[in-house]
């Protein structure tokens, strides 16, 4: 297994799909990385040489991925919460942030229903 950005990339998958196992790399970014590295999308990871894997590592290193991306996102949310702005309050209360209705629906964000105690 090739190791890129601290993640074991599955060998049996095509390069485009295999790179999406890295947090922060979707299909579009995966295609861009492969184009910059000069590698075909339909090649399996097991068929790549060490040199090609090294170029993939270098291309992935140009982006914010994995732990750094997770940290950046959590710091952004924490900043909103510390500011006390509307979006920060919604994050703090565990409610939808982007204006969705909450009288009905929003169950994913609010969690399971709590029974009314009599």
From Swiss-Prot:
Q: Which PROSITE patterns match?
A: RIBOSOMAL_S13_1, RIBOSOMAL_S13_2
Q: Which UniProt keywords apply?
A: Ribonucleoprotein, Ribosomal protein, RNA-binding, rRNA-binding, tRNA-binding
Q: Which SUPFAM superfamilies match?
A: S13-like H2TH domain
Q: What are the record's GO terms for cellular component?
A: cytoplasm; cytosol; cytosolic small ribosomal subunit; small ribosomal subunit
- Disulfide bond positions: none
Q: Where is this region: Disordered?
A: 94-118
Keyword presence, Phosphoprotein: no
Q: Which GO terms describe its molecular function?
A: rRNA binding; structural constituent of ribosome; tRNA binding
Q: Does the keyword Isomerase apply?
A: no
Specify the domain of life of the species encoding this protein.
Answer: Bacteria
| Gene3D superfamilies attached to this UniProt entry | 1.10.8.50, 30s ribosomal protein s13, domain 2
UniProt xrefs under Pfam families? Ribosomal_S13 (PF00416)
Tell me, which GO biological process terms does this entry list?
A: cytoplasmic translation
- Which HAMAP family does this UniProt record tie to the protein? Ribosomal_uS13 (MF_01315)
Subunit info here reads: Part of the 30S ribosomal subunit. Forms a loose heterodimer with protein S19. Cross-links to the P site tRNA and weakly to the A site tRNA. Forms two bridges to the 50S subunit in the 70S ribosome, contacting the 16S rRNA and proteins S19 and L5.
**Record family assignment:** Belongs to the universal ribosomal protein uS13 family.
Q: What does this protein do?
A: Located at the top of the head of the 30S subunit, it contacts several helices of the 16S rRNA.
- Protein's name according to its UniProt entry: Small ribosomal subunit protein uS13
Gene name of the record: rpsM
